Amino acid sequence: MQASEIKFFSRKEKNRIEKIIEKNYCAKLDLSNVILAKTSNEKVWVLSKEVGKLDISKLKVINVGLYLGRLKANEKILLSIEGCQLVGRQARRNIAILNETEAEKFIQGQDVEVEKSVDCKERNFVLVKYKEDFLGAGKFVNNKVENLVSKSRRLLLCE
Amino acid sequence: MELEIKPEFEKRYKEILGDEYEELEKVLKSRIPKSFRINTLKISKKEILPRLKEKGWKLKQIPWVGNGYWIDVPTEFLTKTIEYYLGYYYIQEAASMIPPLILEPKPGEIILDLFAAPGSKTTQIAEMMKNSGVVIANDYKLKRIKALATNVQRFGAMNCVITYCDARDFWKFGLKFDKILFDVSCSGSGSIVTTWRIMKEWSLQRIKMMSKYQKILLASAVKCLNKDGILVYSTCSMEPEENEENIDFAVKILGLSVEKIKVKNLKYRNGLLEFEGKKFDESVANAIRIFPHDNLTEGFFICKLRK
């Protein structure tokens, strides 16, 4: 990635992200102390304010800040694990709650059965939760969650 | 399998340590406990500790790092828990947690971590800065940068910019910093205690080659440092050529000064003032060296330099 490929969001674009999150998860995310940026493939990143003040234009940048998620059609966003953790604390909608067995399957990359759903809309992206932890995102289909966590983050659990 | 110590290694460390050498050899041939750091950007100690103890893990606080713990389980167990998946802790060798403590990053600062991969110290710095300011986390090995990016993401750090650049050329971008972490590539002899394979690669020729290269890198890094700025020099090497000799070079040739370091609850020694007939600047004694048998950690060398 060249630094020139990083597009810092205006206030208006930031508001749009806040609205998308609010619409999908009924969560009011406080983004007042951070800045947002977008890179190729509609990837959205959260950065500390100071990053925006630094001239990184000449650097060969691999990543900036925290990957929040990827913007999708119809004003939706597929959140990363960290994105789910940030949004999850305030979320009131589109939350799929798992039991222990299914949670273990989920973090290994498998699709899972949902124990309890909180206002989950069919075929929507949902936050996957086990006890107090948000494990990542998936797609809610027929009371199941299709696992959408990136392969690089999956784990093989010990016995 | 037992660690085979090379005769030249033994000769060298008998010269440095005298009677204490036997203690070093004993620890090198044993296994030291694994350690990790709780990620307070994501979870509090109060929340995570009971969860880890429920697994039957026996934790022992690392006395020099508030959120560092020793644990006596194999690494493969540490990387296969839901808490690891969620980024609630970071596996890091206990001595490797010291250089960021010396750098003392503060919220809002702009810091350069010149050899950042795989990200242990980068994430520690990001955490100490409470996710504010900027850490430019640079490296030059793409494979290692991939691990760095994954670790920074798993850690939940928002204040890191990961860059790909040969450290010799970083100054050409014109950016200047008040604080630089210079945790340079080295022969790794301090890591023999955790990675016996390094003993096989250990040779005086390799040490001399590394030392020469480190001086080139150091001279370039100093160009990125503001006047009065701090550069923390660290290696996981125990070799005087890669440590005191390079600090002597920084003082006499690059014009930097060495500041005194104090780390509470850690056993360490002063930098050497002489080795194999070579005399170093007196201020080199302000650097610290840690041997594996001092605290049951990897060997480390750390020095705080001011421009």
Residue ranges of model-derived segments:
Chain B
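S-adenosylmethionine
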Residues: 1-307
